């Protein structure tokens, strides 16, 4: 029989469980899945906002939004569209009931346990699809899942459970690379946003001067060719700094320092075409963006809370 077995609301930042259903089936298979719930809660920040983990006879689905993740355990044959529609209802109700200040400042596990009442009622509705089908419209969710299907988490990305390495890890040596591609950065700060805008401005200024250099190149004997290359390299470096500021990549800090070095070299070469204030502005912005890239790190691992 296809059905939802349990659901939880977890804070993404540190894996703190905020609320959960309390009548979870106590079979051995479900208890094993609770371990996967616990492991996933530690790594929510590393995954996209819509994911599925298949554990054999059961599936764990979750969505994340505004720093909170909504997780559910269901049987393997439970329809995906119903699963994510269920999670979407939990998300809408939770956001309506609790503001971000409360969720961000919560310190005790299950401090919103009263939300369990809504989880239970919604779970009962979704475990009776005949009565449910006349009350909700699943077409939008079906289209959304078709256009943007949930990320299928390989078992090896969870690492080990209770010190015992998962058997699936042997077949998934590249898991670290997959996970890092979806890792999230800490929320952007005001200084980070300013750095992003200034870097775009420097890139635009370099691009404009590069096109002017092309015009001069067409009218001269080719002496402006090297300046044109320097301007376009400066543009590429500024845009790449914007990319590093927004997205997580491997060796991110090293890449940012190398990019800053390229910005400095380009401005040294363009010394004759820019005054000291222009050079100071471009180099200072490059240094400021590099600092912001270094400060905005990947979200850390969560502590060990039971879910």
From Swiss-Prot:
- Organism per entry: Rattus norvegicus (Rat)
Job of this protein: May be involved in vesicle transport between the ER and the Golgi complex.
Q: Which residues lie on this side of the membrane: Cytoplasmic?
A: 2-187, 248-253, 296-307
- Where does the sequence pass through the membrane? 188-208, 227-247, 254-271, 275-295
> SMART domains, from UniProt?
Longin
Q: Which protein, by its recorded name, is this?
A: Vesicle-trafficking protein SEC22a
Top-level taxon of the source organism: Eukaryota
Indicate where the modification N-acetylserine is found in the sequence.
2
Lineage of the organism? Eukaryota, Metazoa, Chordata, Craniata, Vertebrata
């Amino acid at each position: 029989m296809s059905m939802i077995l349990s659901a939880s609301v977890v804070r993404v930042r540190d894996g703190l469980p905020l609320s959960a259903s309390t009548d979870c089936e106590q079979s051995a298979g479900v208890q094993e899945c609770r371990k996967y719930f616990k492991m996933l809660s530690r790594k929510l920040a590393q995954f996209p906002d819509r994911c599925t983990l298949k554990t054999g006879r059961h599936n764990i689905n979750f969505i994340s939004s505004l720093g909170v993740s909504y997780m559910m355990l269901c049987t393997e044959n439970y329809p995906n569209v119903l699963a994510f529609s269920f999670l979407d209802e939990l998300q809408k109700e939770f956001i309506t009931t609790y503001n971000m200040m409360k969720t961000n400042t919560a310190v005790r596990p299950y401090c919103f346990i009263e939300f369990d009442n809504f989880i239970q009622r919604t779970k009962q509705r979704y475990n009776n699809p005949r009565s449910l089908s006349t009350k909700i419209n699943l077409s939008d969710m079906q289209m959304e899942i078709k256009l943007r299907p949930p990320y299928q988490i390989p078992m090896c990305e969870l690492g080990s459970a209770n010190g015992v390495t998962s058997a699936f890890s042997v077949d998934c040596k590249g898991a670290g690379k997959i996970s890092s591609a979806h890792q999230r950065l800490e929320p952007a700060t005001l200084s980070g946003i300013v750095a992003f805008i200034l870097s775009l401005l420097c890139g635009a200024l370099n691009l404009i001067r590069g096109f002017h250099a092309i015009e001069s190149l067409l009218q001269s004997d080719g002496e402006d060719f090297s300046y044109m290359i320097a301007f376009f390299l400066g543009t590429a470096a500024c845009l790449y700094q914007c990319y590093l500021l927004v997205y997580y990549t491997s060796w991110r800090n090293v890449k940012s320092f190398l990019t800053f070095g390229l910005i400095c070299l380009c401005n040294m070469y363009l010394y004759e075409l820019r005054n000291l204030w222009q050079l100071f502005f471009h180099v200072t912005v490059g240094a400021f963006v590099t600092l912001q890239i270094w400060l905005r790190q990947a979200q850390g691992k969560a502590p060990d809370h039971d879910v």
